[in-house]
Each structure stands twice: as structure tokens, then as C-alpha cells.
């Protein structure tokens, strides 16, 4: 059997750490990538097509899109949905970065053997605990794994192990190097968080220079200076970093409007009466998205969960939904094309008269409102084809 490796990613944005991960993998690589909305409840800095192009330029062979109802989920559900898509495409291996050196295949075997017992353990825990707390207690109890509170990729890797249990998928953990959630650009591999912050700082500076230039003389707008980040981004995609971008600031007025006017927030996915009341009260005084999160979260409702809930509200995700049967292709190389040829009937390459996933397509329409320079995200868009050199 040919080795085909799956990777679950956001690439928000793609950086040298991601390039390093891809370079550690032999053979064809399929990336199941979040679309325009991220797992932690935020819009992607660059749209899905831009990020797919980055991935293909740096070694991915096939990039497929996670529907929004998979991409914006807690770790277990995010992992489960993504692994199912990759397994459907025929992967033999799943590669991911982790801060830990444990054997995740062994963890998957333990979960496969004790799944019923482990899930019962979670259900028996006190209701006031958050789901991440319950999950960590489960892993500690059944495997002895310890958590130090600063291993987000390890937590996600455990979710991958759980999702891959019993599916005959070999788990390949690649040791992560660098501070992957640092907010500062440092030597070595910079985090996606640091790159996002730096990019918005550079964009604000460019906009200010453009404004000042227009006030003095009629000249061309200032160009985005990417020199500050060039050491942290693969050179082949550096220019792509000048693409249109967005963040929650662009959508906050829309979110305020939705929360204030919708009298039935409880109809939204995972929103209950208690949260509805908290949101209605908090939105009256919150001046921005981060303030709203701070006002709503509690020990039980973590910040990550609140950010996802706010995303569901903005995107109008209902309580009940079905996942799409077909897999949407964003781009491929020659090797990726060979994988697609083996999966005819499972894929959709162009969204037109035939829809793919209504909720994702509507979510993309809202995403487009975040920057006037964003292009149409679905209708008529064809997969990116990586030309071989």
C-alpha cells in the first residue's frame, strides 16, 4: 500500500514551522485545512484560497476544505471531522506537531480498547467543569499523561489519537521547535499568533503612510513592508503575505447587531438560555470583540468556547445540521491529482449550480464582508493547480 500522509491544519498564516512539518514527511501529503473560520473562533487572516496556495507552494500535494461545522469546533469534534475526511481520501498516516514525545499510537490503542469506560468517566464528572478540563482528567486517569497548561498542540494531538483509534492510521508526531504561541517575533520559528499581530501592525502603518501621502501629494499608496517578517516566512510565499486580510474588528459591528436584535439566540448551535442572557447583557457595554469575550466567559464557559459561540451567532449556525457528503478541493499538485483520480465520486471541484455545503457557503459570504478586496469565495472558483517546475 502506498503511504499517503494526512495533515490537519489551519495555516493561519502559513509559516516556516509549517514548512518544516511538511519537509519531515515522505510521499504524497493531503492537507485537510480549515476554510475561512478557525477552530478557536476567529476569521482567518487570509482567505482559504490564499492559504491553500501557500501550502501547495511549500510541499502539500492536495488541499481539501474542512466545512465550517467541523473547523469551528472544540478539539475532539474538530479532530474527528477532519480525520474522517482524510480517511475517506485514503490516508495511511496522520502527521502533526506536538510538544510531547509520547507514542500517540499507543494512546490510540488505549482509547480503542477502553472507549466506553473513558467516555463514561467524562460523563460522570461534575457539570461545572469545562469540557477541556474533563478531557484532561480522563487522559490523566487512564494513561497517566500530565498536562502543564502550555501544550496546546499536545492536547490537539491527543484528540487526533482519539479520532484515529480503530481506523488503521499510523500516527506520526513531529517534535515542535520554537514558541508556537508566543506573541513576539523571535529567533527561529515564529508563531502564527506573532505573525498575525505583526501583519496587522504593519498594515496599520502602511495605511497611515498612504493617508499622509495622499494628503501631501498625489502619489501611489504606500507598499506593505514585509521585511520585519521575512525571516519567519518561506521566501517562496513572502509576497503572498501582502494579500487582503481581516480580523474580528471587521465583524464586531455585525455581531453586535445580531446579538441585540435576535430574540431567539437559543436556536443557535450550543447557545443555551444562560448564555443568551449573558450575551445580551454583555453586548451593551463591550467596545470590541475581546471585551465581549471577557465579559461572557466563566470557568465553565472558557474563552475559546465563548469565541466559538460568538462565531456561531455571527454565522447563524443552527442547532441541527448535516455534514456535506462530498469533499471540496482547494488545490492539488500532480501527485495530488493521482489521489483525486482514485476518489472520483467523493469530491467536488467547482461550486456552481450544484451547492456544496450551504452553511459553509453562507459563512464565506459573511467572511467576504471583512475586506472589500476579498474575491468571491465559492461560485466559479476552480481548484489551484500547482505547476511542476
Swiss-Prot record:
Its main location: cytoplasm. It is an enzyme of class 6 (ligase). ATP binds at residues 8-21, 97, 153, 176. InterPro entries: Rossmann-like_a/b/a_fold, tRNA(Met)_cyd_acetate_ligase. Keywords: ATP-binding, Cytoplasm, Ligase, Nucleotide-binding, RNA-binding, tRNA processing, tRNA-binding. It catalyses: cytidine(34) in elongator tRNA(Met) + acetate + ATP = N(4)-acetylcytidine(34) in elongator tRNA(Met) + AMP + diphosphate. It is found in: Cytoplasm. Its EC number is 6.3.4.-. GO terms for cellular component: cytoplasm. GO terms for molecular function: ATP binding; ligase activity, forming carbon-nitrogen bonds; tRNA binding. One of its GO terms (biological process) is tRNA modification. It comes from the Bacteria. Catalyzes the formation of N(4)-acetylcytidine (ac(4)C) at the wobble position of elongator tRNA(Met), using acetate and ATP as substrates. First activates an acetate ion to form acetyladenylate (Ac-AMP) and then transfers the acetyl group to tRNA to form ac(4)C34. Belongs to the TmcAL family. This is tRNA(Met) cytidine acetate ligase. The gene is tmcAL.
